[in-house]
């Protein structure tokens, strides 16, 4: 059964990643109304008779979201049953399921009633939490903690501050990026790093949305760089923290490069999807570090208790 659960966890993680990228594809191609205002039917039909490209994209996104719902539900039930001895299992299972349902309902509401771009931007963030929760659940199932000796990890307050701070802030950056997509502001500023050679400062809403995201992205790049330097200096003996921050910096660097290329490739589809891919992976890594941070306090108390007993 454990082998089956491992396969299920991997397939579920991949399916949720496809859901995230599919949502970005729907937004990028303007396929949100590919099935009209019908939900769960498509243009009022179970199998649509007229298949335009927008209909195929929207319908594919609905199908992958539906399969993800089934897989996540099954994974939550089995992990709850067979891995309940691991402290975070129940919490992650609940988060995975609740946020997947929330993003499905929000997607359905957007189709039937429509939503403002500021509200639609939350949709990606909700999906991202479900994806990260399933990734963490998968890590627990594969016992990644034991391989990195993460269960005995103790971090100082400074490192935990950076972990929690960067993760929360990354969610804000994700929202600003999703808002750029939904406001159709990807090409509002044709130059980089400033908005335009003729007008360095933004003058209208779409330009402010674009430049706001750029500033937020630059700040998270600098913050992760600083945290990585701290990890390299002080956590070489803790490989999970050491490599966690190095991987985070690699991902945020790739994210920044692709973000710049989005501007200079006229917002090409491949660059837009890579942009969504890298931020999804980065958020999952940061959430894993958050989980380690919550354990650190427990580990410190246990170490102090053992120390008192030995005295």
Swiss-Prot record:
SS bond partners: 35-42, 189-195
Specify the protein's topology with respect to the membrane.
Multi-pass membrane protein
Instruction: Mention one GO biological process in which this protein takes part, according to its record.
Output: heme A biosynthetic process
- Any one GO molecular function term: oxidoreductase activity, acting on NAD(P)H, heme protein as acceptor
Alphabetical UniProt keywords: Cell membrane, Disulfide bond, Heme biosynthesis, Iron, Membrane, Metal-binding, Oxidoreductase, Transmembrane, Transmembrane helix
Give the EC number(s) listed in the UniProt record.
1.17.99.9
> Where are the active-site residues found?
58
**Domain of life here?**
Bacteria
The record places the following residue ranges in the Cytoplasmic compartment, namely 1-6, 84-91, 143-159, 233-243, 293-311
Catalysed reaction(s) here are:
Fe(II)-heme o + 2 A + H2O = Fe(II)-heme a + 2 AH2
* Any Pfam family matching the protein: COX15-CtaA
Q: Where, in this chain's numbering, is heme b bound? A: 213, 275
Residues where heme o binds: 61, 123
Main location per UniProt?
A: membrane
Task: Tell me the cofactors it needs.
Answer: heme b
User: Domain text from the record?
Assistant: The N-half (TM1-TM4) and C-half (TM5-TM8) domains are connected by an intracellular loop. Each domain is formed from four-helix bundles and they align in a pseudo twofold symmetry manner. The N-half domain is the substrate-heme O binding domain and the C-half domain is the cofactor heme B binding domain.
- What this chain does, per the record? Catalyzes the conversion of heme O to heme A by two successive hydroxylations of the methyl group at C8. The first hydroxylation forms heme I, the second hydroxylation results in an unstable dihydroxymethyl group, which spontaneously dehydrates, resulting in the formyl group of heme A.
Similarity section = Belongs to the COX15/CtaA family. Type 1 subfamily.
Protein name as catalogued? Heme A synthase
């Amino acid at each position: 059964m454990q082998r089956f659960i491992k396969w299920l966890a991997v397939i579920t993680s991949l399916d949720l990643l496809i859901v995230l990228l599919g949502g970005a594809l729907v937004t990028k191609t303007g396929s949100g109304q590919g099935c009209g205002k019908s939900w769960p039917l498509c243009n009022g039909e179970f199998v649509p008779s007229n298949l335009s490209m927008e209909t195929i994209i929207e319908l594919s996104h609905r199908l992958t979201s539906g399969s993800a719902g089934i897989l996540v539900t099954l994974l939550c039930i089995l992990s709850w049953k067979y891995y309940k001895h691991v402290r975070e299992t129940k919490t992650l299972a609940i988060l995975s399921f609740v946020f997947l349902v929330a993003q499905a309902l929000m997607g359905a509401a957007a189709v039937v009633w429509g939503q403002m771009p500021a509200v639609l931007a939350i949709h990606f963030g909700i999906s991202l939490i479900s994806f990260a929760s399933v990734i963490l659940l998968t890590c627990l199932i594969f016992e990644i903690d034991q391989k990195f000796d993460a269960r005995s990890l103790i971090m100082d307050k400074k490192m935990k501050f950076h972990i929690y701070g960067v993760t929360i802030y990354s969610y804000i950056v994700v929202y600003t990026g999703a808002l750029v997509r939904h406001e159709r502001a990807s090409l509002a500023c044709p130059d980089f790093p400033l908005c335009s050679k003729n007008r360095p400062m933004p003058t209208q809403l779409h330009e402010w949305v674009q430049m706001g995201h750029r500033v937020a992205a630059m700040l998270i790049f600098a913050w992760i760089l600083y945290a990585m330097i701290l990890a390299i200096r002080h956590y070489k003996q803790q490989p999970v923290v050491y490599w966690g921050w190095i991987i985070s910096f690699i991902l945020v660097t790739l994210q920044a490069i692709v973000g710049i290329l989005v501007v200079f490739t006229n917002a090409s589809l491949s660059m837009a999807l890579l942009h969504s891919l890298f931020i999804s992976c980065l958020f999952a890594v940061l959430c894993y570090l958050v989980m380690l941070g919550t354990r650190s306090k427990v580990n410190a108390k246990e170490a102090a208790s053992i120390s008192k007993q030995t005295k």
